[in-house]
């Protein structure tokens, strides 16, 4: 097993061309001078970044693999692929050389392979029928676009038809289906396969890494933190519409012990209104009660204080949405990684942001009504 906590020797990056469609590994690019990889759980494409090159720009049809490599203190050579991306190059620059000749160079943006889905519009209305298996339908769309999947199957069936407009993208459809089935939004693994798996609460995830300032530390000096409680909603309104009626449920944070509650914030109301596309229940009363329960859950989830901890570290084998801990000079935190920004240098300096939900039992008022159309 590779030793990521000890010294690293001969560290650097490899940039390999990956054949589109077959995903075979082709030759290495030796003209990429620098690169950066930005991973964000909140970005639709999840992965972006940039690179600089000289000579001919990297191919824009084939994919590019960015691979971190080093030799650990046990002599083991580590090659870890960090991302497989698409490249879009800017127009090149030309520089005159002493003694004649011209040097071509340029920069390029990189994106995850989800860009294939986000760039492909439906062009005509598209309906996913009631009774369809949501995850099977999402998997079919992705593989139909030429991508591979890492898919965990599900038995969830859609309860009603859903039609998408022509200007929606394939990624819009896929993420709708994933959300309906209780899955996390689409991401790609380091090899470019699209990951389809159920959403798991951060507190239920196995800890992937602990950043500690001890003898095995990978940390660079200093950490920082922020708390976003002022932006948390204190009112959640959910609506669900049928051809005959509209259901409305409202949940209000009325807990005087909560900094974000209506009693504490006075006139500073922070409300969120969402439309629900799927609602279980055989009767009107059951559907309304289910909507009220969902509004309460969303308010409790949304009213949790969000504590962000930012660490600067050598690159370690973690991914966005992994659970991670911080033990630093008496500070103890644990949450989910929301962003990883890596500079593709021998030190592979990486900025990681960890989000922790601080949940408390709240006093919540929930109301609901059914409005006839």
Task: Report residues per predicted region.
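Oligomerization/assembly interface segments of phage tail-like spikes and tubes
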Residues: 37-56, 102-115, 238, 301-312, ...
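Short beta-strand-centered interaction patches in the first periplasmic/extracellular domains
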Residues: 2, 78, 94-117, 153-232
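Glycine- and charge-enriched low-complexity intrinsically disordered segments
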Residues: 358-373
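Extracytoplasmic/secreted envelope proteins and their assembly/folding machinery
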Residues: 135-139, 171-174, 235-236
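Polar/acidic, low-complexity leader/linker segments enriched in S/T/G and N/D
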Residues: 1-31
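Surface-exposed cap/loop segments at beta↔alpha junctions
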Residues: 2, 55-149
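Acidic, small/polar-enriched beta strand-loop surface segments
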Residues: 1-10, 175, 200-347, 369-373
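Extracellular/virion structural assembly segments
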Residues: 22-70, 116-117, 121, 128-132, ...
């Amino acid at each position: 097993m590779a030793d990521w906590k000890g010294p690293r020797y001969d560290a650097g990056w490899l940039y390999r061309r990956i054949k589109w469609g077959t995903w075979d590994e082709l030759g290495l690019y030796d003209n990429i001078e620098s690169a950066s990889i930005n991973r964000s759980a909140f970005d639709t494409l999840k992965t972006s970044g940039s690179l600089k090159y000289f000579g001919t720009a990297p191919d824009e049809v084939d994919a590019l693999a960015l691979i971190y490599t080093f030799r650990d203190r046990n002599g083991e050579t580590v090659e870890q692929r960090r991302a497989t991306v698409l490249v879009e190059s800017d127009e090149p620059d030309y520089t005159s050389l002493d003694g004649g000749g011209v040097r071509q160079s340029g920069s390029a943006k990189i994106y995850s392979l989800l860009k294939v889905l986000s760039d492909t519009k439906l062009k005509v209305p598209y309906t996913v029928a009631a009774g369809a298996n949501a995850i099977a339908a999402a998997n079919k769309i992705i593989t139909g676009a030429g991508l591979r999947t890492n898919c965990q199957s599900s038995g969830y069936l859609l309860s009603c038809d859903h039609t998408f407009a022509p200007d929606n993208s394939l990624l819009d459809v896929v993420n709708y289906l994933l959300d309906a089935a209780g899955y996390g939004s689409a991401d790609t693994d380091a090899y470019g396969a699209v990951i389809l798996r159920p959403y798991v609460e951060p507190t239920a995830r196995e800890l992937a890494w602990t950043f500690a300032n001890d003898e095995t530390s990978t940390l660079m000096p200093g950490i920082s933190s922020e708390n976003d409680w002022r932006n948390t909603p204190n009112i959640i309104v959910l609506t669900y519409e049928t051809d005959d009626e509209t259901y409305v449920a409202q949940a209000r944070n009325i807990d005087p012990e909560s900094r974000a509650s209506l009693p504490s914030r006075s006139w500073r109301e922070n409300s969120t209104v969402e439309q629900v596309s799927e609602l279980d229940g055989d009767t009107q009363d059951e559907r309304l009660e289910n909507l009220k329960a969902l509004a309460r859950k969303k308010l409790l989830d949304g009213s949790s204080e969000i504590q962000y901890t930012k660490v600067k570290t050598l690159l370690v084998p973690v991914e966005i949405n992994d659970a991670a801990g911080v033990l630093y000079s008496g500070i103890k935190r644990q949450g989910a990684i929301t962003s990883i920004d890596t500079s593709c240098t021998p030190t592979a300096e990486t900025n990681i942001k960890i989000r922790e939900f601080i949940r408390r039992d709240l006093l919540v008022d929930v109301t609901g009504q059914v409005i006839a159309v």
